[in-house]
Amino acid sequence: MSQIACPQCLATNRVPEDKPAEKARCGSCKAALFDRHPVEADEKSFDTLVNRTDIPVVVDFWAPWCGPCRMMAPAYEQAAAHLEPDVRLLKVDTQANPGLAARFGIRSIPTLAVFKDGKEVTRQAGAMPGPQLLRWIESVTAYA
């Protein structure tokens, strides 16, 4: 049984291993737990989305004024469509959430960080094209 935090209401849900996770719904708010899009996280939701989820979580620390961030956004969106429900992808706007950027020592954007069991396991700074981004996420989450 996997534990997944609902991206809508942040309730913790248990998803049976023998059921298709992509069809799972939140027991509290009935929202889909996965919609094949990155989840926007903020200072209120970040810890719940990372710590109450058994699957690897990839976080894109970005800013709206960052050209490379905007260029990588469609590839990150496609990666979410390809990788969910095996990997949860989050986006954190560092301009709107400077506390999270400071907490994780984000010095350049975009920066991708991978978390497993609430702990950061690796990170990568800089934008990547779609195929490279997908390969990197698959390679680092395979062992997370």
Locate the predicted segments by residue.
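Short pre-active-site segment immediately N-terminal to redox-active cysteine/selenocysteine motifs
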Residues: 54, 61-65, 108
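Short cysteine-rich clusters marking metal-coordination/redox-active sites
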Residues: 6-9, 26-29
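Cys/His-rich microdomains that often coordinate metals
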Residues: 13, 33, 73
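Short linker/helix segments within small regulatory modules
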Residues: 15-24
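Thiol-based oxidoreductase modules, predominantly thioredoxin-like and allied folds used
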Residues: 41, 61, 76-99, 106
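Non-catalytic, surface beta->alpha helical segment in thiol-disulfide oxidoreductase systems
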Residues: 108, 113-144
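Conserved redox-active cysteine motifs that mediate thiol-disulfide chemistry
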Residues: 61-75
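A short beta-strand-turn-helix
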Residues: 38-57
